[in-house]
Amino acid sequence: MVLLAVGELSASLSLLEECWHYLFLGIIQGLTEFFPISSTAHLKVIPLLLSWDDPGVAVTASLQLGSIIALIAYFWNDLAFLMRGISKASFQNSWNNQNTKLASAIVLGTLPIVFAGMLIKLFWQGYETSPIRSIPAIAVVSIVMALLLLIAENVGRRTRNFENLSFWDGQIIGFSQVLALIPGVSRSGITITTALMIGWERKSAARFSFLLGIPAITLAGLVELKQAFGSFELVDVFPLLLGITSSAISSWIAIDCLMKFLQTQSMMIFITYRFLFGTLLLFWYYLAF
């Protein structure tokens, strides 16, 4: 009986610890997916700093579901309006309107990252363990992205919005999204940076980035989940659901905060954070290892 009691206590502590890990990682996923600071980088670095095991592809893909749910829920009215506009255009055979332009931009902007992702899966078998995903690489990329965002803040005219959306906007921003396959770049970071560089105002740049992210994040999450299917045991289900829930809630908060923040503020807080994050990460890595 004593041995059984000890075993049950140990199991409960293990489950409690696992719940805490998933809860915390879900919050990190949600906040860093939509703030332009790279969720992949933080989900790789933070567990390492805390001496936790690497969460792995299966866990990060699952946590990404929470971000997808929050993103679709937050922009549900935009998506419904977009679909109604497309439906109306199809009945009237009139495709030269803002809804169809936006839908085309999202579809065309998603194609480059889909093809690039497929090529990596097919031909780069060592991608998950390649030097491009190492801590020093993530640190350097974070610093480079800080500099690019700083340039975008200073050279962008910030005069364009959805009223001025063109065919090339979707192409240019979509091709830049491919760089998000490099850990540390940040999908929202590179797309917002590119939009600012070609003259978009901050809030519109963020909104288009998030709308463009719906198919990209959804497809990436589903592909990784399919590959990882069957790797979870029954005991993992509750902690995993807890992580997905915390990811969804923190994602919603991050999206809402960023949209409101960019109405009046610049990107300097994120530029500063990314520069400090990359610099401190380099120092820590070379001192620790």
Swiss-Prot record:
Topology relative to the membrane: Multi-pass membrane protein
Reactions performed catalytically: di-trans,octa-cis-undecaprenyl diphosphate + H2O = di-trans,octa-cis-undecaprenyl phosphate + phosphate + H(+)
A matching Pfam family: BacA
Spans through the membrane: 23-43, 56-76, 104-124, 135-155, 165-185, 210-230, 235-255, 269-289
GO CC terms of this entry: plasma membrane
Primary location class: membrane
Swiss-Prot/TrEMBL keywords: Antibiotic resistance, Cell inner membrane, Cell membrane, Cell shape, Cell wall biogenesis/degradation, Hydrolase, Membrane, Peptidoglycan synthesis, Transmembrane, Transmembrane helix
Presence of keyword 4Fe-4S: no
Any GO molecular function: undecaprenyl-diphosphatase activity
Biological process, per Gene Ontology: cell wall organization; peptidoglycan biosynthetic process; regulation of cell shape; response to antibiotic
EC number: 3.6.1.27
Superkingdom, taxonomy of origin: Bacteria
Disulfide bonds: none
Localization, UniProt: Cell inner membrane
Top EC class for this record: hydrolase
Further information: Bacitracin is thought to be involved in the inhibition of peptidoglycan synthesis by sequestering undecaprenyl diphosphate, thereby reducing the pool of lipid carrier available.
Family: Belongs to the UppP family.
Function field: Catalyzes the dephosphorylation of undecaprenyl diphosphate (UPP). Confers resistance to bacitracin.
Name listed for the protein in its UniProt record: Undecaprenyl-diphosphatase
Source organism of this protein record: Prochlorococcus marinus (strain SARG / CCMP1375 / SS120)
